[in-house]
Amino acid sequence: MKTARASYVGIVAVGIAVLLTASQLRSTAQPTIDPAIRIGASDLGGRVTSANGPEAGVWVIAETTDLPTRFIKIVATDDRGRYLIPELPKANYSVWVRGYGLVDSTKVRTAPGKFLDLNAVVAPNAAAAAEYYPAIYWYSMLKVPEKSDFPGTGPQGNGIPVALKSQTQWLDVVKTNGCYTCHQLGNKATRAIPKELGDFKNSEEAWARRIVSGQAMTQMTNNIKRLDPPRAYKLFADWTDRIAAGELPASKPARPQGVERNIVITLWDWAGPKDYLHDEISTDKRKPTVNANGLIYGTPEESTDLFPVLDPVNHKATQVKMPVRDPNTPSSKQNPMTPSPHWGPGPIWDSQTSMHNPMFDEKGRVWFTSRVGAPANPDFCKKGSEHPSAKLFPLEESNRHLSMYDPKTGKITLIRTCFPTHHLVFAEDANNTLWTSAGGPGSGVIGWLNRKMFEATGDEQKSQSWTALILDTNGNGKRDDYVEPDQPVDPTKDKRVVAAFYGVGVNPLDGTIWGTVLGFPGYVIRLNPGSNPPATALAEVFEPPLPGYGPRGMDIDRNGVVWTPLSSGHLASFDRRKCKGPLNGPTATGQHCPEGWTLHPYPGPQLMNVTDPGSAEASYYAWVDQFDTFGLGRNVPIGTGNANEALLALVNGKFVVLRVPYPMGFYAKWMDGRIDDPNAGWKGKGLWSTYATRTPFHVEGGKGTTSKVVKFQLRPDPLAR
């Protein structure tokens, strides 16, 4: 394993209300026209200056509600403070300046086709400037237990659970695989205690009440129980108390530099205020010209059965209802809850389908992991069935299944799977095999659908298969009888592991299936289906070496290298070709190939009391731009910067930060890239993502703020149109 030193250039923002005089806020009445700023009828351009002179690397934001859905476009200024916002739809816009070291300027009303110079406003003090910092800078102020406090000795000892052997395990819970899994921490909404929560003797009591708010209370209380709850409440209370007393982040974000100033960001509202999104999809991952200029589809998971659809050409958002096969399918509306300080005592989520992840196929149809019925499986999945997969490893239940939506006909096809589903990806094979992950490791299986067979026969039973994950610990290269996970390795047999994929990807070079396994330290697993799966399927397991731990989402590049974010604050790559020792046999059980790993520290500060490499970043997923749909090159891995409020692209060992400065609180769980016109240069391509926090009411704007589709484009320079 090697650790890469990754420098980065960061950017951020978010708004606060500041009272300023009209002279500070007015735009220049007679702009000085710079010949380098060449605007057309749909553009806006000009210069941004403050009391300090031209402001380089700040954002100019244009927003309108004149279109069928809210529309926002954002660009950065060049090194002389000049800007150009290209291709604005015809409408009236509010335009203002945001940037580090500044406070928001007054919003100026204007229309496209004009030169508009803007006066930026220097922040009057450090506290006013810090209000615009990304969440990671505030979350890094959280003090965590010292390394010397571990291992945990339980309630009769130091209070820390015995299961927590190290500080790194504690961090895994308060970052990607626990407290940060579903929403951001460090934003304005979470670094303060809302008065609507109630009156409490101290902040520890307030935090204990806070985490049981709403319909996610069970998940949040289960996560806090993994820590020492009294100590955790005390540390989070100390964090918010220090901030309330005026303490500020120790480090400051940098403004956009280099190519970061060439980024154009476009946003559209596309969901209801009580809905949250998990993912979006714009094209076929294998062929990113599919669905060119077409509709964008989203998955609202536990919040609603209405999946959002955005028309980015006509700026319209609509919804389609996903059905279930069994009307008695449980709904998230039934989740236990305590009143929310934002929404009161009633539930706001109501979903039977739990749509999690979408994927386009080459025919322009959208496939979903969604719930079809109750968890109890039909008989063909269970022990005693003649189904080939059930004979090898019967399954009693599955909490999510598959569905397919055909936009041309409006038809929705439901597919009941025996195996649980979470994410999905199509293979580049003759069967267009649809591989799925299960989410948590408990099911112990990976499942797939032979799409060619399903389309030919409509038989969902015969078209699906699944397998347990079996390691070739006897080293003979084939699948044999195996020992169970709780039994020691037997050199004459194989061994089953209790694992299932969270992220899932297909190696385009050899067709093997790779996935991440949640937990500490977590794993990536390679599944070779063999010639007759599931009977021939064999797995290999690889554990990230410290200081790396806690993988979550993942992807693979065209060279077969796996990329995954780690809870340790790294973007990790794993290249199996670098392994020097045996890849099967009794010693190939996880820690046998540290040389295959490279850890790239994410940008941003580290949490307090943490001396290990990495950062406070809690990245959720990684996606590889295999076909250069953005403009930074082929095979560029991009992580979701959930605390950085950005996408984080690794280019030649350095991170390029694609930050979304408005509205503050960008939190993505997925992205994809689409080529609308291969002959149109930068205008014909782009990345797509969405605000995927479960708490859109924590985003700048508060209650009523909705999830947004975000498009990223990369110009050759900040004034290109």
Feature roles, as predicted:
Residues 42-44, 50-66, 90, 139-155:
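Short, ordered, surface-exposed loop/turn motifs in non-cytosolic proteins
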Residues 189-196, 291, 298-301, 368-398, ...:
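Short, conserved, GDST-rich strand-edge loop motifs in beta-rich repeat architectures
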Residues 38, 65-87:
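Short, acidic Ser/Thr/Gly-rich low-complexity loop/linker segments typical of extracellular
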